């Protein structure tokens, strides 16, 4: 990635998000240290803000507008990372796939790996991204299911269902 940061088709996105118990502020950390040229993908706001549950997928227009505001176009190669190495970047990667953008990758090691490798970071307000051209979200239903879909998969054993929460969260703690 370091040798491709100046490439016009590369869009680097910091999708850091932390659990409340972590006591970390993802936006403040983004402003303090990030991969040069990165834009901040706010998982808290790129969502259906009218839903009772947090972090529900946004509508196609909301995702389109949010992604275009980050300078991401239809032909952009998006590289997503987070401040833990691999935590919330996976959520952003999945959201891009749900909305039809296949040219998305997760940076191995995230920001901690980038820093450990000795690469430069920048701080302060990011350069305002030029609005992305041509990206229009197109929901891909194969990437999402509902309760009935999960029940059917469990009963038919056609899929493996994995709960990726930590053990304490899985146990309701």
Question: Language model features by range: what are they?
Answer:
Residues 1-173:
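Cytosolic catalytic domains that perform sulfur/thiol-centered chemistry
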């Amino acid at each position: 990635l370091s040798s491709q940061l100046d490439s016009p088709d590369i869009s680097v996105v910091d999708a850091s998000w932390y659990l409340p118990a972590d006591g970390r502020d993802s936006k403040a950390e983004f402003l303090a240290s990030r991969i040069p040229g990165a834009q901040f993908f706010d998982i808290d706001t790129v969502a259906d803000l009218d839903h009772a549950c947090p972090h529900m997928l946004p509508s196609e227009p909301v995702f389109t507008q949010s992604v275009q505001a980050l300078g991401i176009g239809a032909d952009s190669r998006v590289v997503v990372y987070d401040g833990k190495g691999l935590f919330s970047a996976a959520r952003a990667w999945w959201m891009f796939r749900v909305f039809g953008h296949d040219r998305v990758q997760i940076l191995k090691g995230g920001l901690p790996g980038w820093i450990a490798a000795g690469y430069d970071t920048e701080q302060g307000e990011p350069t305002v991204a030029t609005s992305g051209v041509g990206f229009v979200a197109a929901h891909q239903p194969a990437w999402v299911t509902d309760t009935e879909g999960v029940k059917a998969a469990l009963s038919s054993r056609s899929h493996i269902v994995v709960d990726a929460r930590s053990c304490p969260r899985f146990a309701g703690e």
